[in-house]
Design a protein with these regions (language model features):
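Short glycine-/aliphatic-rich beta-strand segments at the starts of folded cytosolic domains
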Residues: 7-15, 50-52, 87-98
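Helix N-cap motif at beta-to-alpha junctions
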Residues: 18, 57-62, 100-101, 132-137
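Short amphipathic alpha-helices in soluble, non-transmembrane regions
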Residues: 25-27, 65-73, 107-112, 140-145
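Long, charge-patterned amphipathic alpha-helical coiled-coil/hairpin "stalk" segments used as oligomerization
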Residues: 84-128, 134
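Single conserved hydrophobic/aromatic residue that forms the stacking wall/gate
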Residues: 163-172
């Protein structure tokens, strides 16, 4: 791949859980005109340390710049670019689907095929929860759209490397 070819990259960024860190990280992207596809921030197994999973479409040159700039942010502890073939990544999708007594069984059948689940049932709708790859979630949405999608929300990817990545055990 040429340095100017744009491709999808997933970064796992360990940061100290301090006020304003998320703003500082997103501000770095914004100031330089880099677009974030998705960003998820969550606690890790180590108290006081959060993991940011950042997905971006960028060239190798831009990714080098992103990594250098992130390393300048003091509460950033470690940055790892996750390789697609050595990573498990999933997103969460919740969909409110029009479903009455007539079509509800078909909606539930479709949900079950995708190993998703119905988390709420109302008179004229159901709320479906699904986790999976972007492809799986898009396929489920394609199946549900003919019934009528009333509301939709989807998280960004959370990801873990299948290869052990040593992590810090203390805060500086």
């Amino acid at each position: 791949m040429a340095p100017t070819d744009v491709s999808r990259h997933t970064l796992s960024v360990l940061v100290e859980d301090v006020e304003g860190i998320l703003s500082r990280v997103t501000g770095m992207f914004s100031r330089r005109g880099y677009s974030i596809i998705s960003l998820v921030s969550a606690q890790t197994e180590n108290p006081g340390i959060n993991r940011l999973t950042i997905v971006v479409d960028a060239s190798e040159t831009i990714m080098e710049q992103v990594t250098k700039q992130l390393n300048k942010i003091v509460p950033v502890i470690k940055i790892v670019e996750l390789e697609a073939d050595a990573t498990v990544a999933r997103a969460l999708m919740m969909v409110k689907v029009a479903a009455n007594n007539t079509n509800r069984p078909q909606v539930v059948d479709a949900v079950n095929i995708f190993r998703a689940r119905v988390v709420d049932v109302a008179q004229e709708s159901v709320v479906v929860e699904a986790t999976g790859t972007p492809g799986k979630l898009a396929a489920l949405l394609d199946v549900l759209e003919p019934f009528g999608v009333l509301e939709l929300v989807q998280s960004g990817d959370v990801a873990l490397s299948l290869i052990h990545i040593s992590e810090p055990t203390r805060l500086g």
